[in-house]
Amino acid sequence: VIGEDSTESYSIESELLKNGINITRLNGPRMFNLFSYFSMYSQFRNEKFDVIHSHQPRSDFMVYRINKYLSKKSKWIVSVHGKYDTYLEKGSLSNNLRKYFMKRLSKHWQSAFSIIAISEEVKSWIENLNHELNVVVIPYWIDIKNSGTIVKKDRVTLGFLGRLNVNKGIEDLIDALNSDELKSLDFKLMIAGSGTDEYLEKLRNMIEKDNIENVNFLGYIENREEFFNNIDIFVFPSFSEGLGLVLLEAMSFSKICITRNILPMTNYIDEDSGYLFDDVNGLSHSIASSIQDLENNIE
């Protein structure tokens, strides 16, 4: 059962259908709506699922509430994909509400059959929320057959891939491109991923205001292999991640990687295997250094 209607969920749906797995989509309003609860309750009651596996806080909350009222209780498995209350928001009120909600949700997780974290970092975060929870770590995986080689192109191409929101640090990346250190270098930036129209407009306005050229927004992409084959350097300026799977993907394609100097990214990248930065100036310098290293080492 796939709930929220989005480009990403349709991609997941197509993969499941290829493997002969039937899909029921529960379209409708989000969590705090009686229609959503009624639709999900009816589906759970009629199908009598042995296992229910939820993947997002909204889904966790709904499954917890509905499963309490089912005559046949399903085994509920929770997968936690990030440190949800650490993501950046516009104001302190929203931050406080998020923290309150996560603390409350962590108590509901106590009724789950199993709780899965995608990294040790996320496991520690969960246990700090509620020390009574027993958490198992099952990391994401990548297909190492994607491993590629670095080849010289006419122009150095930087790339970012991920959901476009404040937490991903795209604004820092745009600010870095406007630095004097990078103005004399010849490169382009490809930004792949979806975001709200409002936030995309904000990013485009930043680029236009600073007269930055050669930045392309690709939107959501299905073919990640093609994206990685078309870039030379992967920039991942996110402020908070549960694992940073896309960083591992970039590494599997032998791309030079630049990422913020925070956990869990520093579990995979150090000064010998990539570039770490702390602020916008550090990001500018890392981009300049990586471009120079790329040009010096590829014939």
What are these regions (language model features)?
Residues 121, 141:
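Carbohydrate-associated surface elements
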Residues 2, 256-259:
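Short hydrophobic beta-strand element within catalytic cores of glycosyltransferases
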Residues 41, 96-114:
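Membrane-proximal helix-turn-helix segments that form the acceptor-binding/catalytic region
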Residues 156, 160-179, 198-202:
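A conserved mid-protein helix/loop that constitutes part of the nucleotide-sugar donor-binding site
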Residues 220, 239:
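Aromatic "clamp/platform" in nucleotide-sugar-dependent glycosyltransferases that forms part
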Residues 271-282, 290-298:
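Conserved acidic donor-binding segment of nucleotide-sugar-dependent glycosyltransferases
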Residues 202-219:
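Nucleotide-activated donor-binding/catalytic signature segment of Leloir-type glycosyltransferases, i.e.
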Residues 54-60, 80:
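Short His-centered aromatic/hydrophobic patch
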